[in-house]
From Swiss-Prot:
Similarity comment: family membership: Belongs to the DNA polymerase type-Y family.
Organism name: Streptococcus pyogenes serotype M4 (strain MGAS10750)
Protein residues bound to Mg(2+): D18, D116
InterPro entries: DNA/RNA_pol_sf, DNA_pol_Y-fam_lit_finger_sf, DNA_pol_Y-fam_little_finger, DNA_polymerase-Y, DNApol_IV, PolY_HhH_motif, Rev_trsase/Diguanyl_cyclase, UmuC
NCBIfam families: PRK02406.1
Main location as per UniProt: cytoplasm
Identification of the protein by name: DNA polymerase IV
Keyword Ubl conjugation: no
Binding partners and assembly: Monomer.
EC number, as in UniProt: 2.7.7.7
Organism phylogeny: Bacteria, Bacillati, Bacillota, Bacilli, Lactobacillales
HAMAP family: DNApol_IV
A Gene Ontology biological process term: DNA-templated DNA replication
Active site residues per record: E117
Length: 364
């Protein structure tokens, strides 16, 4: 017996776009000499004493088992000839803006998930094109011609299937999952490929003898709810290709922040304040990009021994002014108890966000 009826909206046309090895691809585009070589975006461990983690890497590096969040030291051990690049995040942000402009050419119903990934609802698009596959191909064409980068596209009737489809054939792939093919498509997938199913849930599912979408399809809804609570309700529907979550072009952001981890520990106040300034300016720029203002400034400090402190100050009025954010974050730091251990991470975050109103001018 179902807790809730199975309502499956198959009328939508949704594309999930995922840029291929984005940061590394931008570096290859700007330096053709890197093509065909393993490229890792991360600090060279030979220069940092082994510290640092991989942000991303190109497909050549992935052949050696290198992946995001791996330590740079391990990445080097797996592939000593890998080329390590610290990364230029302002450049990546500029390219990300170009990418979003291409999406908006076809529809305003765009939900960015990160700088290199977005859902695009083209059910009612600006060009009146009926085929979502055609629009996906046009986006891929525009991306290559105008930005010099490739992307993979997944086309289906909901976000869940679109995301899985874009991962199915990379790089520069295009996969279509029709409603009549959804069950077959999902049945063959390992459960760990299901978007939104985390590592602990995968382990629990494996303990239940569930390894594939086909296995999951056979489990009664109440059994899944007994084991996973509310998430069991979602699992039951995902196994059937049901996910009615809308593409939210106005996703509500609860916070905007910037933080950096340092290969060399920070000890000097001048260095610390300089890094707080960089983070504050980054936050101000992001607030401007997202047309947001905020009231609460949060400073995060992580020391060499991994002790982490966060402290916040709420302002009387909304702001996105870089100098003000920097001043408040600096004052927060001054109020912390002295700690002789060096600092390995600093972060500045703005919360209590509201949309920018026309009569407030608080630009950089």
């Amino acid at each position: 017996m179902l807790i809730f009826p199975l309502i499956n909206d198959t009328s939508r046309k949704i594309i999930h776009i995922d840029m291929d090895a984005f940061f590394a691809a931008v570096e290859e585009r700007d330096n053709p000499a890197l093509k065909g070589k393993p490229v890792v975006i991360g600090k060279d461990p030979r220069e940092t004493g082994g510290r640092g983690v991989v942000s991303t890497c190109n497909y050549e590096a992935r052949k050696y088992g290198i992946h995001s969040a791996m330590s740079c030291k391990e990445a080097y051990e797996r592939c000593p000839k890998a080329i390590f690049i610290s990364g230029n995040y302002e450049k990546y942000r500029t390219v990300g803006d170009q990418i979003r402009r291409i999406f908006k050419r076809y529809t305003d119903v765009v939900e960015p998930m990160s700088i290199d990934e977005a859902y695009v609802d083209v059910t009612n698009n600006k060009l009146g094109i009926k085929s979502a596959v055609k629009i996906a191909k046009l986006i891929q064409h525009d991306m290559w011609k105008e930005v010099g980068l490739t992307c993979s596209a997944g086309v289906s009737y909901n976000k869940f299937l679109g995301k899985l489809a874009s991962d199915f054939e990379k790089p520069h792939g295009l996969t279509l999952v029709l409603k009549e093919d959804a069950l077959c498509f999902l049945a063959k997938l390992p459960i760990e490929k299901f978007h939104g199913v985390g590592k602990k849930s995968v382990e629990k599912l494996h303990d239940m003898g569930i390894y594939t979408g086909q296995d999951l399809l056979a489990v009664p809804e109440m059994t899944l709810i007994d084991h996973f609570g509310r998430f069991g309700f979602d699992l039951y529907r995902k196994a059937r290709g049901i996910s009615n979550s809308p593409v939210k072009s106005d996703r509500i952001r609860k916070s905007i922040g910037s933080e950096r981890t340092y290969a060399k520990l920070l000890y000097q106040e001048t260095d610390i304040k300089a890094e707080i300034s960089k983070n504050a300016k980054r936050v101000a720029a992001l607030l401007q990009d997202h047309k947001k203002l905020g009231k609460t400034i949060v400073l995060k400090v992580r020391y060499a021994d991994f002790t982490t402190l966060t402290k916040r100050v709420t302002l009387p009025e909304l702001t996105r002014n870089a100098a003000q954010i920097e001043q408040v974050a600096g004052d927060i730091f001054d109020s912390l108890s002295e700690n002789p251990a060096g600092i390995r991470l600093l972060g500045v975050t703005m919360t209590n966000l509201e949309d920018k109103v026309a009569d407030i001018s608080l630009d950089l």
